[in-house]
Each structure stands twice: as structure tokens, then as C-alpha cells.
């Protein structure tokens, strides 16, 4: 018997500007191969300003940013002020350990939208400008490989549609062998 992984869309966020945090919204239109309609990070090629300077033609593997509400709760307990949307995430989830999912996992958001996970968010220096010590608080070093961060995972939109706060998230794992997430 296969255990079904199910979570919930706790909050949604979008901003047309390249700001660190994003304001809350009640629903969002996801566009296949693009991201969230009206969000500064949506587009078929990289939209993050630091990455555009290096190579603006690269595919955008960071169309939609997800953070678990459980991380927000943990950081608040440690004294950080991190409301939903504070990390610049588009989607705050509950009930899923996003960092444990392999690359290529697909998440069905509500009835229509499907996104595919591409990797961990690699935070820029703005995270410590937002709150001192936050970068260290979300860092971890696996037994092998580079230092990683648990301040969210990135994804691309496979199938578009509208997502609303409270929608169910259903996870489908890719075929084995599973590839662990790396930073993108």
C-alpha cells in the first residue's frame, strides 16, 4: 500500500517588484512554463536579478517558491519575526516536509495546477539584511555535498490554473532512483 502525501496551501503571495518579502493574496493564477501571473519572478527564463546578470537566457527553474509553515513556526519559536511571505515565497504549505521530497516530485495544487520541484532555494545576502542571523538559522550541511538551506524549495509550473488558500496539495513522487534536491 502506498502512503499518499497530502498537504494544504496555507497562504499565497505575489509581488510585481523584486522585493525580499511578498504580500499575501487569496488566490493566484499559475501559468504553465511561466510562474504566477503578475509576479516579478515569473517567466520562461531566469528572472532573479543576480542570476540574470550571469546568464539571462537560462531556463527559469525558480518560477514558484514554496516554504513550509512549519519552518515559519520553528523560526518564530527561535525569536525571528517571519510571517508568511517573509521569505519571498509564493506558496506557504502545511503538512509536507518539502525538503525531503526528491527533485521532480509533482505537487497538484487544488484541482488543476501541477508544479514540479526543481531544488532548494539558494538564498542571497538579503536574507541577513532582512534579519540578522536568519541565513545561519536555515543552513544545514548534509553528510556529503555542499551546504544547503531549508528556506524553501523552487519549482516550475507544469499545468496552469487557479490556486486558492486552503486548497489541497497532493504529492506524486518521480520514478526511482530519486535524486535529492540541490540548490538552484
Spans of features found by a protein language model:
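Metal-cofactor-dependent catalytic cores
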Residues: 1-184
Amino acid at each position: 500500500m502506498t502512503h499518499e502525501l497530502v498537504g494544504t496551501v496555507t497562504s499565497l503571495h505575489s509581488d510585481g517588484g523584486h522585493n525580499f518579502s511578498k504580500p499575501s493574496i487569496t488566490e493566484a493564477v499559475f501559468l504553465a512554463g511561466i510562474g504566477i501571473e503578475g509576479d516579478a519572478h515569473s517567466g520562461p527564463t531566469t528572472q532573479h536579478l543576480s542570476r540574470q546578470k550571469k546568464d539571462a537566457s537560462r531556463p527559469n527553474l525558480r518560477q514558484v517558491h514554496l516554504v513550509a509553515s512549519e519552518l515559519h513556526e520553528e523560526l518564530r519559536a527561535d525569536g525571528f519575526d517571519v510571517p508568511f511571505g517573509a521569505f519571498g515565497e509564493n506558496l506557504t504549505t502545511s503538512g509536507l516536509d518539502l525538503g525531503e521530497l526528491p527533485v521532480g516530485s509533482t505537487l497538484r495544487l487544488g484541482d488543476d495546477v501541477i508544479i514540479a520541484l526543481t531544488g532548494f532555494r539558494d538564498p542571497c545576502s538579503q536574507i541577513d539584511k532582512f534579519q540578522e542571523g536568519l541565513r545561519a538559522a536555515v543552513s544545514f550541511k548534509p553528510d556529503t555535498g555542499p551546504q544547503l538551506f531549508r528556506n524553501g524549495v523552487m519549482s516550475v509550473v507544469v499545468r496552469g490554473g487557479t490556486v486558492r488558500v486552503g486548497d489541497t496539495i497532493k504529492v506524486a513522487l518521480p520514478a526511482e532512483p530519486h535524486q535529492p534536491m540541490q540548490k538552484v
